[in-house]
Amino acid sequence: LMAGTSAFAQTSNQIYTPTPENIKARQEFQDNKFGIFLHWGIYSMTAQGEWYMNTHNINRNEYAKLASGFYPSRFDAAEWVSAIKTSGAKYICITSRHHDSFSMFDTKESDFNIVDATPFKRDILKELAEECQKQGIKLHFYYSHLDWFRDDYPEGNTGHGTGRPKGHGNWASYYKFMNKQLTELLTNYGPVGAIWFDGIWDQPTNFNWQLEEQYALIHKLQPSCLIGNNHHRTPYAGEDFQMFERDLPGENKAGFSAGQGISELPLETCETMNGMWGYRIEDQNYKSPKELIHYLVKAAGKNANLLMNIGPQPNGELPATAVEHLKQVGKWMNQYGETIYGTRGGDVVPHTWGVSTRKGDRLFIHILDLQDDALYIPLKAKVKKAIQFISKTPLSFKQEKDGI
């Protein structure tokens, strides 16, 4: 995920036709509406976030020493999945390999991984994948296109102070490395709900990432695996959902979505529970449960999923505040989940007072900030009845030509 901005464009002459399995997976993805993002790696030991290697120009040889001390003794996949399910989330997306190149799984393509380079010696992605299947929640993998560590990744806009030789890069080698790792992830870890790409904004606009071939490989290995790419542009051929970083669709408050239209693909917005993606010890600026719920509702009202991020601690635990917030969001979802799960953006466009979602012939009006005693809802459809969702108490309304 980005700490700065740059542009990237990729064109395609190919026509991507998704398989029936993929179409079904897209619908399930839209129905699920809510996921939890986990940014976890050896950078958590710095307690300064996932960009620490780049922002502090840490030499890669020194940075690699973090691995020898990484021993998350309190990691328990069952506890993680259970806590996340409590929130009402239907899927988990975890960093398999971030920009620092450290792989959080047992890869044969690099010894810079959690099994070979740490005293922990456990494949946490394998444990998490098995637990997700056991508890009935989907697992997605974040995968970085850029790399601050390897010599074969071509020099880009970031990672200049990590000690790699000037003018380094061997694209053919790096591309082969990525595809072999993706093959491992899609072969050894059971059903994968999605691959969540990030980082192609690191290269110039004319850089050829060979996405078509890479996407085709993923769809060949697992046809129902969805592909999304955090390039901050309108989706390219081969992608199955569109993502928005720290923004609701159609907005550009974070500054990443200026060149991004809204496609017909399923939509997802990602946001942090506090301020950072990776664990940062002094970042206690958590959004309140109410703020998180409102963001989830607003995303649903804009026909999008919410992928809400937590940065696990270096000892393997989820932060206590995050766990408590998951519980509070879950309490709300237990009551109002029917108005979120399986819905699409409603017929009433988002307003300052709230949003709407719909399911069949039912329209759910989510009033988040009512300023007056009465509310005018612009709606051309004829309303048969209006009730308060929980109590089922009938609500009085007046049908007019263009609304109620």
Stretch-by-stretch model annotation:
Residues 10-404:
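Mature catalytic domains of secreted/periplasmic carbohydrate-active enzymes
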Residues 1-12:
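Bacterial Sec-dependent N-terminal signal peptides
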